[in-house]
Curated annotation (Swiss-Prot):
It comes from Thermobifida fusca (strain YX). Residues 35-422 form the Helicase ATP-binding domain. One of its GO terms (biological process) is SOS response. One of its GO terms (cellular component) is excinuclease repair complex. Belongs to the UvrB family. This is UvrABC system protein B. CDD domains: DEXHc_UvrB (cd17916), SF2_C_UvrB (cd18790). It comes from the Bacteria. The beta-hairpin motif is involved in DNA binding. The gene is uvrB. One of its GO terms (molecular function) is ATP hydrolysis activity.
Length: 701
């Protein structure tokens, strides 16, 4: 089933590098999980309460099992958070990030009722695309790989076999005609550009060919003597500094959808045959408009494929390129893993239904396009996997959740591994049920107590209107409050949470955003209004997740305002009290005094604002003397320690342009939640500006 490739994967061991040692429930959980998985259990569930260190447990488990691992997260933000934490703990292994590369995506659709065709429109994030290619490259070249992915991993990707077949292997001493090498690069979808040297392009200078692989930040230089490869070097694309030499380099294609000439011919023949068949069906049914539309669109796409090797919406023809039978599942990221890989599904109560629901939503939209002649029926096979297909392609699976869903519990017969004792000794919050009469006055009283103690409060309501009204009312009373809702963009959301932590305001009001993955140690009170209104926002799982937001504070409390105790409330309170009793008993037995969680508050957003003002002033001064600015070369410097040294070789005008470009990159990195990259760029900009000021004082041009 899985294609066998000739490429050799390097076999470095998984290794956790950290000052931490397993504590609380972690040692027992790691031991039991390893025992079950090594014993061949197909499914295992870790019931890990909020703040018990599930990420660290996963890292130590991977080190113990020594198996490539796929971690699936419910959204991009949690995937980035998990990947960053794993990278810190496993610095010598390949921890990759694989999520949808669209910043904005409007899928192709047709609305028959109004005869409206909506063309596909999207904006691709190049850095995320690089990380996707980096993930597939790592999977095919090394065994010590962990990929943290969103549900994007069950969507179609080119076949790993074709990806490897199109790969170019270059070795020192190898004989190859230079023009043949350039032809190979073009077939792999690389573009020649001798002026703007960016990712996915190559340039030629005499017998030297330089490429920036689409999955890398560094360039590869191939030096030839005649038809023989003399040297292979890795270099920095901006400074040209040589960072290393190799005897062999693999260059993977610039696209996951790449096909050789023979496969392209077969695919085009298949598309044309399907077109004739479908046109006959439409004409027989009297659908002449649909037939004409399909003929025009498909003929144009075929011409583009013949001339350019690709076309808009090429993924809709993936079945023909892969040589798959109608109705067969697509190739996905799962096919790039070795046979023995482990799957970890985090926040499984959300992620499992999400994986299961992707297929139907996609099929409903495509069905309309096919019926009305916008696409061939084979477009239906460019789709996500169904749940059953996903299960067939995955082996052993570990489900992580503070509130495992019915599917996971059924798979293990309710026999879960528990991790409810926190290494810090913190216990689950005390839950208090209060009547709804006078609830707002009581809430205001509780908020004032917390504000005096410099603690924070989360308030969760049922409707947007109620959240807005409550925010206005609290503001009128002089309480520092903000409202978090779905229309706030991602970066502003991160900023709001940070402002809550540092104390810019004391209360955050929300609806359904105060649940999975929010890490707020300063919050000592979570108030749940209308806790007795049954529905998905007040189900047992939702309540336990919301209660968990107060579990990172020594004196955390949850106040539920309700007139009756529903079954969901009773179950959530009972489970919280069970965990709390177990945690208190453990602390008493081991003499542990709960320690407040001190988690560093990221200063990235704050420093971006300061950096902006400083950069604007410096650039204005620097530009005042000369008109016109050269376009700086793309990329980022390799590290702040070498920046000042490298900058000495740049003229002042070019240095100012580089500062401006890196500032843009810093903002983009922050917007993409790549905070480590943004912080690194911030440090580089500081070094460059120091050099620029020095040149300014010395009067150097």
């Amino acid at each position: 089933m899985r294609p066998v490739t000739d490429i050799q994967r390097t076999d470095r061991p998984f290794e956790v590098v950290t000052d931490m040692v397993p504590a609380g429930d972690q040692p027992a959980a790691i031991e039991e999980l390893a025992r079950r998985i090594q014993g061949g259990a197909a499914d295992t569930v870790l019931l890990g309460a909020t703040g018990t260190g599930k990420t660290a447990t996963v890292a130590w488990l991977i080190e113990r099992l020594q198996r490539p691992t796929l971690v699936i997260q419910p959204n991009k933000t949690l995937a980035a958070q998990f990947a960053n934490e794993l990278r810190e703990m496993m610095p010598h292994n390949a921890v990759e990030y694989f999520v949808s590369y669209y910043d904005y995506y409007q899928p192709e659709a047709y609305v028959p009722q109004t005869d409206t065709y909506i063309e596909k429109d999207s904006s691709i994030n190049e850095e995320v695309e690089r990380l996707r290619h980096s993930a597939t490259t790592a999977l095919l070249t090394r065994r010590d790989t962990v990929v943290v992915a969103s549900v994007s991993c069950i969507y179609g990707l080119g076949t790993p076999q074709e990806y490897v077949d199109r790969m170019a292997t270059v070795e020192v001493g190898m004989e190859i005609d230079r023009d043949e090498l350039l032809r190979r690069l073009v077939e792999m979808q690389y573009t020649r550009n001798d002026v703007a040297f960016t990712r996915g392009t190559f340039r030629v200078r005499g017998d030297t060919v330089e490429i920036i692989p689409v999955y890398d930040e560094l360039a590869v230089r191939i030096e030839m003597f005649g038809d023989e490869i003399e040297r292979l070097m890795t270099l920095h694309p901006i400074t040209g500094e040589v960072l290393g030499e190799s005897d062999r380099v693999y260059i993977f294609p610039a696209s996951h959808y790449v096909a050789g000439p023979e496969r392209m011919r077969k695919a085009i023949a298949g598309i044309q045959a399907e077109l004739e068949e479908r046109l006959a069906e439409l004409e027989a049914a009297g659908k002449l408009l649909e037939a004409q539309r399909l003929r025009m669109r498909t003929t144009y796409d075929v011409e583009m494929l013949e001339q350019m090797g690709t076309c808009a919406g090429v993924e809709n023809y993936s079945r023909h390129f892969d040589g798959r039978a109608p109705g067969s599942p697509p190739n996905t990221l799962l096919d790039y893993f070795p046979e023995d890989f482990l799957v970890v599904i985090d926040e499984s109560h959300v992620t499992v239904p999400q994986i299961g629901g992707m297929y139907e939503g996609d099929a409903a939209r495509k069905r309309t396009l096919v019926e009305h002649g916008f696409r061939l029926p084979s477009a239906m096979d460019n789709r996500p996997l169904t749940w059953d297909e996903f299960r067939e392609r995955t082996g052993q699976t570990l489900y992580l959740s503070a509130t495992p869903g019915p599917y996971e519990l059924e798979r293990v017969g309710g026999d879960v591994v528990e991790q409810v004792i926190r290494p810090t000794g913190l216990v689950d919050p005390e839950v208090i049920v209060k009547p709804t009469e006078g609830q707002i006055d009581d809430l205001v009283h509780e908020i004032r107590i917390r504000a005096e103690r410099d603690e924070r409060v989360l308030v969760t309501t049922l409707t947007k209107k109620m959240a807005e009204d409550l925010t206005d009312y609290l503001t009128d009373l002089g309480i520092r409050v903000r409202y978090l809702h779905s229309e706030i963009d991602t970066l502003r959301r991160v900023e709001l949470l940070r402002e809550l932590r540092v104390g810019v305001f004391d209360v955050l009001v929300g609806i359904n955003l105060l649940r999975e993955g929010l890490d707020l140690p300063e919050v000592s009170l979570v108030a749940i209004l209308d806790a007795d209104k049954e529905g998905f926002l007040r189900s047992e799982r939702s309540l336990i997740q919301t209660i968990g937001r107060a579990a990172r504070h020594v004196s955390g409390q949850v106040h539920m305002y309700a007139d009756t105790v529903t079954d969901a409330m009773a179950a959530a309170i009972e489970e919280t009290n069970r965990r709390r009793a177990k945690q208190l008993a453990y602390n008493a037995e081991h003499g542990i005094d709960p320690k407040p969680l001190r988690k560093k508050i990221a200063d990235i957003l704050d420093s971006l604002a300061r950096e902006d003002a400083d950069t604007a002033e410096l650039l204005a001064r620097s530009r005042g003397e000369k008109r016109g600015t050269p376009t700086p070369r793309s990329g980022a410097l390799s590290g702040p320690d070498r920046v000042a040294e490298q900058a000495k070789n740049l003229p002042r005008e070019e240095l100012a342009a580089l500062v401006e470009q890196l500032t843009e990159q810093m903002h983009q990195a922050a917007a993409d939640l790549q905070f480590e990259l943004a912080a690194r760029l911030r440090d580089e900009i500081k070094e460059l500006k120091r050099e620029l000021r020095g040149m300014e004082e010395a009067g150097i041009g």
